[in-house]
C-alpha cells in the first residue's frame, strides 16, 4: 500500500500592513434601520423607519442613500422576492394583531417598546435579504433600498452589474 504524507507547509502570504488590517473592506454593504416616526391620526396612523444604506458594491447605483419605509413596504418586498426570485426569503417580524385591540393598557402598535422590537426585526430581515447575492440582482430590492418612492407597477427584472 502507498503511504500518504500530509503536506504541512504554510501558505505563502504577503505581510499585512495597517491599511489592510484596519481599512475599509473590499466589498461592504451596511444597512441600518433607525429613527422610527409615527405619522397620521386615527385609522390612518402608521410608523415609518429610516433605511440608511452605505455600500461600495458596484451593483448599487448609489453608494449612500436614505429612504423611509413602513411595515407594509417590507411586506411588499418580501412578496416580490418570493414571487420573482430563487431566494429563500426570511420571515418578517410578526404582525401585531393583538395590539390592535381597543382599550389596551399601552399604545398598541405605537408603543415605544413594540416599535423598537419591530425596528430590530426589520433590520435583521433587510440585512439577511440584501446580503444574499441573488437578491442583490433583484430590481425590487434596489427600489426598496434606494428609490424615494417605490414604483409598485414596475416590471420585475434583474439588475446588471455596472
UniProtKB/Swiss-Prot annotation:
Residues 147-162 are annotated as: Binds predominantly to PtdIns(P5) and weaker to PtdIns(P3) abd PtdIns(P4). The modification Phosphoserine is found at residue 72. Changing residue 161 to A: Abolishes phosphoinositide-binding of C-terminus. Pfam families: PX (PF00787). Residues 27-151 form the PX domain. Highly expressed in developing red cells and hematopoietic tissues. One of its GO terms (molecular function) is phosphatidylinositol-3,5-bisphosphate binding. A 1,2-diacyl-sn-glycero-3-phospho-(1D-myo-inositol-3-phosphate) binds at residues 70, 72, 95, 118. Keywords: Acetylation, Cytoplasmic vesicle, Endosome, Isopeptide bond, Lipid-binding, Methylation, Phosphoprotein, Protein transport, Transport, Ubl conjugation. InterPro entries: PX_dom (IPR001683), PX_dom_sf (IPR036871), PX_SNX3_Vert (IPR042137), Sorting_Nexin (IPR051074). Ubiquitinated, leading to its proteasomal degradation. Deubiquitinated by USP10. It comes from the Eukaryota. The modification Omega-N-methylarginine is found at residue 43. Signal peptide: none annotated. It is found in: Early endosome; Cytoplasmic vesicle, Phagosome. The modification N-acetylalanine is found at residue 2. One of its GO terms (cellular component) is early endosome. Its main location: other. One of its GO terms (biological process) is regulation of intracellular protein transport. Gene3D superfamilies: Phox-like domain. The PX domain mediates specific binding to phosphatidylinositol 3-phosphate (PtdIns(P3)). Interacts with VPS26A, VPS29. Interacts with VPS35; the interaction with VPS35 is direct. The association with the retromer CSC subcomplex subunits is proposed to represent a functional distinct retromer variant described as SNX3-retromer complex. Interacts with USP10 and SCNN1A. Interacts with TRFC. Interacts with SNX8; 2 molecules of SNX8 seems to associate with one molecule of SNX3. Interacts with PTPRU. Interacts with MON2 and DOP1B. PANTHER family: RE52028P (PTHR45963), SORTING NEXIN-3 (PTHR45963:SF1). Phosphoinositide-binding protein required for multivesicular body formation. Specifically binds phosphatidylinositol 3-phosphate (PtdIns(P3)). Can also bind phosphatidylinositol 4-phosphate (PtdIns(P4)), phosphatidylinositol 5-phosphate (PtdIns(P5)) and phosphatidylinositol 3,5-biphosphate (PtdIns(3,5)P2). Plays a role in protein transport between cellular compartments. Together with RAB7A facilitates endosome membrane association of the retromer cargo-selective subcomplex (CSC). Belongs to the sorting nexin family. This is Sorting nexin-3. It comes from Mus musculus. The lineage of its organism: Eukaryota, Metazoa, Chordata, Craniata, Vertebrata.
Amino acid at each position: 500500500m502507498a503511504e500518504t504524507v500530509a503536506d504541512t507547509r504554510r501558505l505563502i502570504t504577503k505581510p499585512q500592513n495597517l491599511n489592510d488590517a484596519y481599512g475599509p473592506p473590499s466589498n461592504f454593504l451596511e444597512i441600518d434601520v433607525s429613527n422610527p416616526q409615527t405619522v397620521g391620526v386615527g385609522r390612518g396612523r402608521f410608523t415609518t423607519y429610516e433605511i440608511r444604506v452605505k455600500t461600495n458594491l458596484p451593483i448599487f447605483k448609489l453608494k449612500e442613500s436614505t429612504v423611509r419605509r413602513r411595515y407594509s413596504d417590507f411586506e411588499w418586498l418580501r412578496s416580490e422576492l418570493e414571487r420573482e426570485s430563487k431566494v429563500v426569503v426570511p420571515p418578517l417580524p410578526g404582525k401585531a394583531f393583538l395590539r390592535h385591540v381597543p382599550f389596551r393598557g399601552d399604545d398598541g402598535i405605537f408603543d415605544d417598546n413594540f416599535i423598537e422590537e419591530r425596528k430590530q426585526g426589520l433590520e435583521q430581515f433587510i440585512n439577511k435579504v440584501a446580503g444574499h447575492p441573488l437578491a442583490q440582482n433583484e430590481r425590487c430590492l434596489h427600489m426598496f433600498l434606494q428609490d424615494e418612492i417605490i414604483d409598485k407597477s414596475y416590471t420585475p427584472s434583474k439588475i446588471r452589474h455596472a
